[in-house]
């Protein structure tokens, strides 16, 4: 079934970027982070950034530039996912999705590319539909609350909004 599905699926299409249209086959490696997920492995506190490859060929161990920060990252131990199974992969091509271990340097919407300057439009953000106010019962746990909320915001799960200060 999967082989027939892959045969019928359309190939990757060129994508619009800040440097014009990027061809998925001829252009050097580039991709964008569309999801960041923490704690996928119950035994470890891991954080996986899911990267959709938009152009070129991805190879394990390649040095790439994160467009938002301009920092160079070495992309090691890329993983492919099938249901609950993880497998290490050495390479991937345009249209593939790989998971990268992340230590907090990647966010949803980041563009990762060998050649700096390429930047894809970010993931659209929608206005929140549900609002909640968080009040802390134990003041000694303020740092834990702040850290937890910031992790959820980095994953794109929540949007943090702060009320303006009433003290001036």
Question: Across the structure, where does each feature detected by a protein language model lie?
Answer:
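Structural and coupling elements of P-loop NTPases
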Residues: 1-168
């Amino acid at each position: 079934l999967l082989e027939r599905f892959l045969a019928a699926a359309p190939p990757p299409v060129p994508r619009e970027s800040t440097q014009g249209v990027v061809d998925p086959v001829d252009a050097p490696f580039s991709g964008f982070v569309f999801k960041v997920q923490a704690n996928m492995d119950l035994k470890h506190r891991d954080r996986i950034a899911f990267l959709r490859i938009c152009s070129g060929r991805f190879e394990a161990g390649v040095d790439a530039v994160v467009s938002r920060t301009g920092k160079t990252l070495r992309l090691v131990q890329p993983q492919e996912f099938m249901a609950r199974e993880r497998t290490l992969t050495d390479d991937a091509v345009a249209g593939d999705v790989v998971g990268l271990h992340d230590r907090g340097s990647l966010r949803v919407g980041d563009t990762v590319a060998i050649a700096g300057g390429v930047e894809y439009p970010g993931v659209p953000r929608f206005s929140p539909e549900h609002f909640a106010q968080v009040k802390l019962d134990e003041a000694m746990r303020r740092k834990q609350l702040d850290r937890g909320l910031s992790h959820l915001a980095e994953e794109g799960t929540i949007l943090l909004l702060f009320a303006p200060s009433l003290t001036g």
